[in-house]
């Protein structure tokens, strides 16, 4: 669902005459979203939007009873910055974006979110804590992140 919504949104920003002539300039992770969105019919897009609204309603229900959702920043340990994003998690093939499912949830909902350092794995890889607040409550994310970072500051230098 997310790739179709994101792909449709990207189409809004493409100047006429740029697609597909410049498709090779897109990141390999981004291009499938464009290709997928180009094939989505209006009825299918309507179904995707209804699915998004159902997710938004479910998230709104959660924020009726909590101020913050705290989750891992990623679903897996850190991977190389130059990529690619992993295509397998716990032996199961997944869309590359599923390494960051909680960020995707915040993007669908349109809510503020922030990631703060939370320690390291047994192998010394960084682990983040993802904080997500209700819509228009950036102050909640920022205040909590400030408290957490003051309590456990991240080291300023890299270690080997």
Per-range role (PLM):
Residues 1-8, 85-87, 129-131:
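Short low-complexity, flexible loop/linker segments enriched in glycine and/or proline
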Residues 4-60, 76, 115-118, 122-125:
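Short helix-loop capping/hinge segments that flank enzyme active sites or metal/cofactor-binding pockets
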Residues 5, 47, 79-100:
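Short, surface-exposed loop/helix-turn segments at secondary-structure junctions
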Residues 46-47, 57-60, 65, 107-160:
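Structural helix-boundary/capping segments
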Residues 60, 84, 103:
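Short glycine-/small-residue-rich flexible loop motifs, especially phosphate/cofactor-binding loops
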Residues 77-78, 138:
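Short, acidic Gly/Pro/Ser/Thr-rich loop/turn segments
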Residues 100-103, 135:
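Glycine-rich phosphate/pyrophosphate-binding beta-alpha loops
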